[in-house]
């Protein structure tokens, strides 16, 4: 009898009992960031979601303001220039392999230059003054072009530390006198200024033993500069107020055999002088100056 009851129980209730489903384990999550911006946004979002509930209460007002304030503080710190940074100048100008191009950007002063700058092009701006401090720490310069500015003053010694400087252009400015020039200069251009003879010292060019090209046209010179170096090849003095030349201007009156072998070109047109009256002044030259003879 008991055996029949047990069999009946198994037949009636076993089909109703089902095995428990297998436990599903969460698969690991993988985050793939397509780019840096997306990654940054995800990280910020995670930080926001991990804030305490009382901080996120009232939604965007508290947390967003805080986030923006913190972001602004970080931006201010990162943008604040340090003493040695070159970023401001190279954002304003173009810096490329030792060359700095600051042309036609209306700057009014020489910008701080990156160290190791060799070539500076700052043409057609509004620079009025060159100070000693502008190049105090930049001794690697080889070429400077300040053409087309408004330069009226150059402090004494502004170029004194530029011992490697070979080319300097101050053309189309408002200079009335010349600064002391660095010793290795090969090319100097001061065309179209307001320079008078008293604005050039007697020995301004004497020690420039590498100077080959000297451009002083369209100024207010009354005479040819003295003590021109033997290295000179091209001399432009056109359109000044030169009225006289003596026998020692280009030659040596006490040495009739002296010849200026390197001088190839002298331009003196546009001056109130008849060159034919001073033929002895050109006896050492291989070619006569360009200008009015009769």
Curated annotation (Swiss-Prot):
Q: Tell me the ranges holding the LRR repeats.
A: 108-127, 128-151, 152-175, 176-195, 196-221, 222-242, 243-273
Keyword DNA damage in the entry? The reply is: no
Please provide an example of a Pfam family that matches this protein in its UniProt record.
Answer: LRR_8
| Endpoints of the signal sequence | 1-19
Q: Name one GO cellular component term.
A: extracellular region
Glycosylation annotated at which residues?
A: 61, 241, 254
Q: Which positions form S-S bridges?
A: 251-284
Q: Supply the alphabetized keyword list.
A: Disulfide bond, Extracellular matrix, Glycoprotein, Growth factor, Leucine-rich repeat, Proteoglycan, Repeat, Secreted, Signal
Q: Which residues cross the membrane?
A: none
Query: Which Gene Ontology biological process is one annotated for this entry?
Result: bone development
GO MF entry, a single one: growth factor activity
Among InterPro entries, the record links this protein to: Leu-rich_rpt, Leu-rich_rpt_typical-subtyp, LRR_dom_sf, Mimecan/Epiphycan/Opticin
**Keyword Glycoprotein in record:** yes
Q: Which family does it belong to?
A: Belongs to the small leucine-rich proteoglycan (SLRP) family. SLRP class III subfamily.
- Stated role: Induces bone formation in conjunction with TGF-beta-1 or TGF-beta-2.
Q: Which PANTHER family does the record match to this protein?
A: EPIPHYCAN-RELATED (PTHR46269), MIMECAN (PTHR46269:SF1)
Q: What is this protein called?
A: Mimecan
Provide the species name: Gallus gallus (Chicken)
């Amino acid at each position: 009898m008991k055996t029949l009851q047990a069999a009946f129980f198994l037949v009636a209730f076993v089909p109703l009992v089902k095995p428990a489903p297998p436990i599903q384990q969460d698969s690991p999550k993988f985050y793939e960031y397509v780019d840096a911006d997306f990654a940054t946004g995800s990280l910020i979002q995670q930080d926001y979601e991990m804030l305490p509930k009382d901080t996120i209460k009232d939604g965007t007002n508290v947390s967003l303001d805080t986030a923006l304030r913190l972001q602004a503080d970080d931006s201010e710190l990162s943008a604040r220039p340090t003493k040695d940074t070159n970023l401001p100048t190279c954002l304003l100008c173009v810096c490329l392999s030792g060359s700095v191009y600051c042309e036609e950007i209306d700057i009014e002063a020489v910008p701080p230059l990156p160290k190791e700058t060799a070539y500076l092009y700052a043409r057609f701006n509004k620079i009025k003054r060159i100070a000693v401090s502008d190049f105090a720490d930049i001794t690697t310069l080889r070429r400077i072009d300040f053409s087309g500015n408004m330069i009226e003053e150059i402090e004494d010694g502004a170029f004194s530390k530029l011992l490697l400087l070979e080319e300097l252009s101050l053309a189309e400015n408002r200079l009335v006198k010349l600064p002391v020039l660095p010793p290795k200069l090969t090319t100097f251009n001061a065309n179209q200024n307001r320079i008078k003879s008293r604005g050039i010292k007697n020995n301004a060019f004497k020690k420039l033993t590498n100077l080959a090209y000297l451009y002083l046209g369209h100024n207010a010179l009354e005479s040819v500069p003295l003590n021109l170096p033997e290295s000179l090849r091209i001399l432009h003095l056109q359109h000044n107020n030169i009225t006289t030349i003596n026998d020692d201007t280009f030659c040596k009156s006490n040495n009739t055999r002296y010849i200026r072998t390197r001088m190839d070109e002298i331009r003196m047109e546009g001056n109130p002088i008849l060159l034919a009256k001073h033929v002895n002044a050109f006896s050492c030259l291989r070619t006569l100056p360009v200008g009015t003879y009769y």
